[in-house]
């Protein structure tokens, strides 16, 4: 389950890719084959529209807790999920580690940026 406490995020981010690979790797490989097939591509698009909506709603719930706008959090979630799914399908440790490192640095930079704006009383983006 996704964390709602910022203190739990680091543990979650470290564990989820490996848990996802173990729990869902085979299923993701099958879904990839099916949803990229021309006969089923429209079903795949609909599936991912729902995924996009769910992650956006989650980002909106996180915004007041971590102080980063949901419009910034949402693409970070997408990068995280893509890295997890890619790892689950291909067990590509290099891809996973590089994506996680850029996410870690990105979140820290965004947190500093929006904390500074908040302290200055501004909302400039």
Where are these regions (language model features)?
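Amphipathic alpha-helical packing segments from all-alpha helical-bundle domains
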Residues: 19, 23, 32, 39-67, ...
């Amino acid at each position: 389950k996704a964390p709602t406490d910022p203190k739990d995020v680091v543990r979650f981010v470290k564990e989820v890719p490996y848990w996802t690979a173990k729990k869902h790797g085979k299923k993701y490989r099958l879904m990839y084959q099916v949803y990229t097939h021309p006969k089923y591509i429209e079903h795949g698009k609909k599936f991912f529209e729902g995924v996009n909506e769910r992650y956006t709603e989650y980002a909106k719930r996180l915004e007041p807790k971590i102080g980063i706008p949901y419009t910034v959090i949402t693409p970070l979630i997408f990068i995280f999920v893509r890295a997890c799914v890619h790892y689950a399908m291909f067990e590509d440790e290099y891809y996973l580690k590089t994506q996680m490192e850029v996410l870690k640095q990105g979140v820290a930079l965004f947190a500093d940026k929006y904390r500074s704006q908040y302290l200055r009383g501004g909302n400039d983006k």
